[in-house]
A protein has these predicted regions:
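C-terminal domain-tail junction helix/linker
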Residues: 40, 62-66, 87-174
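RNase H-like DDE/DDD metal-dependent nuclease/strand-transfer catalytic core used by mobile genetic elements
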Residues: 1-114
Length: 174
């Protein structure tokens, strides 16, 4: 949630608890959280759709020692980040016609790759979700600050050599 990185996704023909479990299994495998001892177990934030309130999913979550948090009914803002992702994805994906499920799946795969690794997010200080997820954000922002400082120093140095600008600067200082 904090990085907006899409860990796992699946194109399903149904909205069943088994589909949710399958996607969660992919996420667990990707992160490796099932192979190491973690301080904070992952949690699932979802709406109140039938697949999320089923006993089957509750048992699955309990067996994985994962917490399930549901948003307030009729309050999609609780899941605002993923709702925004879905809107962005639909705006891109709906531009094409897909005649076979594999075509749609291929396009979704390309979109997730772009979203995670190439699309800068203003809310993430203009880095990608992958940069945040893999812990590169601080280093990137520090490098940007360093470049900005050097650029400003260089501009100042060059402007002081320019007779027109240095006279204006002198007049302003008086």
């Amino acid at each position: 949630d904090f990085s907006r990185f899409i860990i796992a996704w699946e194109l399903c023909t149904t909205m069943a608890a088994g589909d949710v479990q399958s996607t969660l299994n992919k996420a667990i495998t990707f992160t490796g959280v099932d192979r190491v001892k973690v301080k904070h177990r992952p949690r699932l934030l979802s709406d109140n759709g039938p697949c999320y309130v089923s006993n089957q999913l509750a048992e699955y979550m309990e067996s994985r020692e994962m917490k399930h948090v549901r948003g307030a009914p009729y309050h999609p803002m609780t899941q605002g980040k993923i709702e925004r992702y879905h809107r962005t994805m639909k705006n891109i994906v709906k531009l094409q016609h897909y005649y076979f499920p594999w075509e749609l799946e291929q396009e979704l795969s390309k979109f997730v790759e772009h979203y995670n690794h190439h699309r800068y997010h203003e809310s993430l200080k203009n880095v990608t979700p992958a940069d945040v997820f893999y812990g590169r954000q601080r280093k990137i922002l520090s490098a940007r600050d360093r470049i900005k400082r050097k650029t400003m120093e260089e501009r100042r140095r060059l402007n002081l050599r320019n007779p027109l600008i240095s006279k204006v600067d002198t007049i302003v200082q008086i």
